[in-house]
């Protein structure tokens, strides 16, 4: 790896919000647990990981809403069986292709591309374990600093 590439890769670590400071859901959480955590943090989307710490996907409010609508009888929200929020796990409603992660070795160019499409970018280590996120805000702040 050339020196310039190595510097670019290392720079993304400075943007990383570590897993310990990031809200996430486990894929075996119930829908109720997921919704409560999202409401508590005020998020509209949140990373999902398995119990081994591997990043799976990102789940959004829309994923919950579409499940509830599909689960209701003929789309009538007054007929939604709320007990299904207690029985259904996150892994039963997720779509694996949302917000793909980047490796910690990703370049800033890759981050910019992803940041244009995603509010946050999940970051994984060499083994696919979730290590944190880079928010669009952090990315923009970093570039604003270097603009001057």
Features from the language model and the residues they span:
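Tandem CBS (Cystathionine beta-synthase) repeat/Bateman regulatory domains
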Residues: 1-148
């Amino acid at each position: 790896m050339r020196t310039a590439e190595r510097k670019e890769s290392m720079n993304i670590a400075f943007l990383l919000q570590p897993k310990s400071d990031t809200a996430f859901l486990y894929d075996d959480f119930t829908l109720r647990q997921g919704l409560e955590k999202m409401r508590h943090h005020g998020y509209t989307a949140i990373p999902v990981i398995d119990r081994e710490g591997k990043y799976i996907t990102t789940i959004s409010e829309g994923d919950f809403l579409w499940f509830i609508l599909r689960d209701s009888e003929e789309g009538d929200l007054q007929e939604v069986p709320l007990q299904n929020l207690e029985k259904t796990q996150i892994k039963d409603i997720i779509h694996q292709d949302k917000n793909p992660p980047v490796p910690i070795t990703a370049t800033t160019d890759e981050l910019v591309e992803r940041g244009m499409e995603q509010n946050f970018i999940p970051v994984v280590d060499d083994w696919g374990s979730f290590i944190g996120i880079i928010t669009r805000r952090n990315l923009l702040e970093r570039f604003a600093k270097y603009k001057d």
